[in-house]
Structure formats: C-alpha cells, structure tokens
C-alpha cells in the first residue's frame, strides 16, 4: 500500500463512521504562543478539548502536518542517523469531543489495523496504563487480544497530560512486531528500545481534569485523542524497517543522489536532505521565513543543516530548492497548498542557500584551521561562537560536524559568550535615569487625538528617577500631568515635543515617554518655578506633530503597498516614525528590485492623491481581525483595540496619531533600502516638505553632473553608459592578461608533476593562502585533467593545506583522507569531501617532508 493510499484509507475509514474530515492546520499554531510549531494531531483541537471552543461536530479525523525542531520537542540532531527521527511528519488521528470513548476508540483502531490494512493480529502488541482496568477488559475480553501480547505500563509511558494542570488521562498503545530477526524486546522490557517492536498508534483517553493540587477530577464529557505516524505505518505496510525506505522519502533521496552523483542511497546526508526539504517547504508554505529569531531561526537552522550535508555529498552549487519539485510529486496532491506556492518556496530556499554558501567554506576553513592547531578533542566555545556570529553556523550544525569527527563541543563556553553579547546589547539599549520606569507616577489621560493644547495639573516631578516637589529655573527633569495632549513614545512613533506653560513659567519638552500609565514629559525649565499641584497649559509643537502624523500615516500605506506588490508574506518587523523621516523593517527574502521600489513608491503616492479620509474606530479584537485589520505578529492586544483605516486600502491596529486625510501627507519618497538581518529588509522614506526638498536637491545634483560631463540632463544616462562600457572593456583586458600570467604559472608548477601507479600527482608549496589557495588548486585540477594535487602555503608559524582529487578518481582516493595524512605531519588536522579538503598545521618545519610523503600515500591507498 502506498503512503497516499494509506492516508486516504485512514480518512475514508473514519469518514464512514461519522467523523468530520478536517484539513491539516498550518504548522504555525493559531493563537497559541505556548507552542513553537504544531507538533501533534490534537493541537488544532486544543481549545475544543479545554471547553473554550465549540465546533459543529463531535467526531473528527485528520492527517495533520507536524514539525518537531526547536523547543521542547526537537528531533533535529538525530535526523539522518536513525530510522524514525524526522523534523516533519504526518500524524493520522481520530478525535471524539464528548461523544464516543474507550470502547469505540479501541474497536476502531483494531478494525482499521487488522481489516483495512490487514496487519496480522499475532504481530500486534497492546499496552494500557497499569490502573486502567476498563481498557484492559475491552482489549482482552471484547477484542480478544492474546494476553501474551498484552502489557500494563506505568504513567511515564501510558498516562498523557496537556500540562501540569488541565485535561489528562491514560493511554493505550499498539505496537507492531517486526519479528525475531530484528533485535529488541517487547514494550515494558529492558530491551524495548530496540527496533523489533515499533509503536504505531497511541490512543489517549482524556477522562480527568488535574487541578493545581494534583487531584484527578473526572471530566463531565470524556474525550478521545489518537495519533498514528503515517511514516511509521507506511514502513510496516511496505515491509521495511527504516522510514527513509518508504515511498515518502525514496523519490527525494533519489533526486538528491542524482544531483550529488552518489550511488549509495544509504548515506546519512541523503536522509538528512530528504527529511529537511519536507520541513522547510511546508514551513515556508505556512508563512515562516528564514530569520534570526523564533520560528524563522529554526527554519534557517534546518536549511543550513541540509546545505552543509549537501556540501558533504560534493554538491558545489545551490541544490536544495531543486527538491521541491519531487516533493510536490509525492505530497502535492494531498496538500495542494504546496503546489500553489511551489515557486515561492523554491525562491526562498534558493536565496537562503545562496546566502549561506557565501560563508560556508570560510567557516569550514576556520574550523579546519582551529582543529589543525588543537588536539584537545573539544571545539572551544569561542570558536563555536565565532562560527555562529560571523559565519552563520547554527550551533547544532557545528555539533553535527563535531560528531562526524568524534569531537565534543564546549557548549558552556559558547553560552558564556552569548551571555556577554546579550548583556552588551542590553547595556547599549538602556535609557538614562530620567527615562527609567517610575513606579508611582500616577495616571495621565491622553487627549492628543482631539487637541494639541490642554490644561492639566502637575501630579509628579522627577529628577534622575527621584520624586521631587519643585523644579527651579535651569533644572532638567520629568513632569507628569493628570491630562496631556502629548503623545508618549510607543509603537515606533516618537514622543511629542512642545512646552508646558503657566504665568511666567516655561518648561521646554524635548521628549515624551511612557511611565506605566503616565506620560512623562522630559525637558528643561527655562523660566519660573514649577511645583506639584500647579495648573499648567500643555502645548504640543504643531510643526513636529504634523510632520510625525504624515510619516505615521505614510507608514501604514507603505505596509499595505509592500504586501500588495511583494506578497502577503511581508510582516512588519520594526518601525520608527519621527518628524523628519520614517523607517520600516519588514520580512522579505531578498532585496526588492529597483522596479519594485518604484512601484511601491508610486502606489503609496497614488493613495495619497486619492485623499482618503483617515478614520479611527474602537472595537473588539476579534471583530477587528474579522474585518481584515492587520495585527502585528507577536504583539499583545487587549480585548478592545483601536483600528486605523485609510480608506479601503489599509486597516491596522494602531494607537498612534495620524493625518486627517491621506492627501495631507503631500508626497512620499523612498530614500534608502537595505538589509538589516537575514530575511529582514529596511526602507527609509520621507514625506511632505522634506520630500519636496529632497527631489529639488536631487535635480540640482543631476544638473551639476550634466555640466561636468558636458551633456544635457536628458543625455546624461547615455553618456554614463558609454563611459561604463569603455571601463568594462579595459577591465576585461586586464583580467585576460592576469589569466594568461596565471596559466603560465600553473604550467610551470605542473612541470613538477609526478606519476605513481598511473595516477599523476603534484605536491608543492605555493605563495599566498586563503581563498587564493583554493582558486589555484581548482585551476591546476582543470589543467591536470586527471590526478591528485596537494598545495601548502606557509604563513608565519602556520601551514595551510588544500588537497584535490579529480572526479574520475574519487571512488579510489579521498581528498579528506589525504589532507589528514599530510596535516598530521605538520601538527594539524582537517577534513572535507572526496574531491576537495583543507587543513591547517602549526609546524612548518616538516612541510617539505609531508609533501614528499604524498607519492607513497597514493601508492598505498589506491583501490
């Protein structure tokens, strides 16, 4: 039975028994910040089990996509090295919400296994919770399971709970016996971790509610939650012991093997790549993009682990994205969302792999150089941190390499360096004393949506975080009023500036910040005395406020335009709204093209010209989401939210101040676009009078440039193109001459090539090092055609080594073994692939002897 037939048979079986077939939920759990990813079939029904949500059915069945990588459930480091660990898997499940219970759940499971997929009953073993007499009676007396294949197990394996408190209950598990030829013992025995007895189905009987004291109280409506891994049952039905040998994986392994030119399909690296393309593709389908934190960083870790294993297989160019097509052939029919977004997934994977490959070789070279001068058997935490911070190596990728070389990782040292980095970041972001949280500053009523001037009472004065009763002329401090039109810095919008006035008194407000429920006005008392209890007039600077609201409303239009033109995967990652500019950080996998930026800018200006009214409305959070208002991912909102609408074009949850109409923005101009982190881009823009001034200055620069080149402004581009073409031709000529010199130098080196047992070889010292050494090796391999090359470069007290074996000889000689042989003689070690490897050493005095030993090594190791 194919995996597709198995999935369909399972869902059809339960559909025929009154179950609603529920499509797989996304891998990102909805409204559940406690979970990184959907990691079990019951996750989409969690609120139903807790009684907080009602569905239009009491029976359900699904084939739920799941990911276990990162967080509590993390199988990443084992994937590729075991038969059943995966980052991505499908959980077949059936569920009852207060409808049927143990008897029907057990009966359904036995019927499906023995009648539908026709597993021999004598191969099935059953376990129940040790105190669950009801389940035991059903299995033994009603189903008729042989007592010899029945076990009672303790709470560790056979009692399930959602958390420390809440719904919980006993489990019953069904195991398949692969037979005595496979090592391992039955469930509950000392040998149960072997591969002979494999759990295929877990039935959870949710019948209790555990309270804070640990008491188990019976639930009024017991429920059923079952889970069966599609991959495991497919392996059983297809007669294999390794999930990677099923039809879910073999097309992916074959495709990766074809790309790598590898005939041995059992290589762990092929399994890693086949597993990881499933997880990465569906995470991207469900809206996760590679980034430096949270879910995006887990995705990045998985992609980079796959790329490194591809490198191990000898793949020298981006390849991972090419596996999306065979994945679509395997899973696209069952999950059409993959087919719909296939091109997008390929683009994300290609960009991420390309970015990582730019640092991969440098990182591996750093690691080899370190290992060449260290024989402690441990990769120091400082090196692990440098690989992570400079070269983008996730820690588990370094651990992967360490395992292959029988090394340990200094996790404690790495964590210490990470803690230092976090502390530096915290120190850099701390405010001065006046901005620190004032615990008892009271509460300010904000009136700045309606007015820029208001009368209020001073309810607090602070200097350096200390409460004072009065401020004298010339003193700086913070003033808290009971009501104020000053907007306090929040949501990316800077605080208002202005002044606080009374008879003979002027306090210049330079900034406004939140202090709990109060607004703190930071500034300097220029004249008069100010005391707690004084009545004052608070006046916001109209010019800076109007400039700020223009930029804030423009930010909303920019966000909408980015999603319209680049795609709905765009999410806000940060913003700054100030009087003089706006800055917007957003998720996107590549730098937008110039054409895209022009379209985005034009789209925003089109909405400005339309002169939409800007309207604010308060409503329930659920209602706001239903009407399409965008909420910032990861932001916490109250039950009632404020929605800002700019016509029909943009609706966002926002507490900031805005223009009255989009036309008030005047003009929108993008002045810069950069990358701030992997998968995060930044746009800086200006509006209004500042945008007009920028355009006028740009026109002036063009006119001056045209004068310098002695052409009219209309012919400026043509003139620059002519000059550029002339420069390119000259650069090509220079490069041609360089290549000619390099070829002559290479031929000179190859004059020293020898031959042993029919294999040509060259082992010699050259000048320089770093990437130039690798380039020289590649050039010599091309000129040699067939053979073995070892190059050494001595720099001070260090030796750098590279070894290359042409493709026609890699089945007989391995560059990694050769470079280790040479490196050992100069006090070092290294590693790499069959066709290329590199190493470092710390004893240059023996480099000539080490190179001289290459001939004998080739002779001894030819197979």
Curated annotation (Swiss-Prot):
**Cofactor note (record):** Binds 1 zinc ion per subunit.
Reactions the enzyme catalyzes: tRNA(Ala) + L-alanine + ATP = L-alanyl-tRNA(Ala) + AMP + diphosphate
Its Gene Ontology cellular component terms are:
cytosol
Q: Does the keyword Protein biosynthesis apply?
A: yes
Q: What Enzyme Commission number does this protein have?
A: 6.1.1.7
Q: Which SUPFAM superfamilies match?
A: Class II aaRS and biotin synthetases, Putative anticodon-binding domain of alanyl-tRNA synthetase (AlaRS), ThrRS/AlaRS common domain, Translation proteins
Q: Which UniProt keywords apply?
A: Aminoacyl-tRNA synthetase, ATP-binding, Cytoplasm, Ligase, Metal-binding, Nucleotide-binding, Protein biosynthesis, RNA-binding, tRNA-binding, Zinc
Instruction: From the Swiss-Prot or TrEMBL record, state where the protein is found.
Output: Cytoplasm
Q: List the disulfide bonds.
A: none
A single Gene Ontology MF term assigned here is: tRNA binding
The record, for InterPro entries, names: aa-tRNA-synth_II/BPL/LPL, Ala-tRNA-lgiase_IIc, Ala-tRNA-ligase_IIc_anticod-bd, Ala-tRNA-synth_IIc_core, Ala-tRNA-synth_IIc_N, Ala-tRNA_ligase, Ala_tRNA_ligase_euk/bac, DHHA1_dom
Q: Which PANTHER family match?
A: ALANINE--TRNA LIGASE, CYTOPLASMIC (PTHR11777:SF9), ALANYL-TRNA SYNTHETASE (PTHR11777)
- Show the domain comment: Consists of three domains; the N-terminal catalytic domain, the editing domain and the C-terminal C-Ala domain. The editing domain removes incorrectly charged amino acids, while the C-Ala domain, along with tRNA(Ala), serves as a bridge to cooperatively bring together the editing and aminoacylation centers thus stimulating deacylation of misacylated tRNAs.
Q: Which NCBIfam families match?
A: alaS
Q: What is this protein called?
A: Alanine--tRNA ligase
Give the organism the record lists.
Halorhodospira halophila (strain DSM 244 / SL1) (Ectothiorhodospira halophila (strain DSM 244 / SL1))
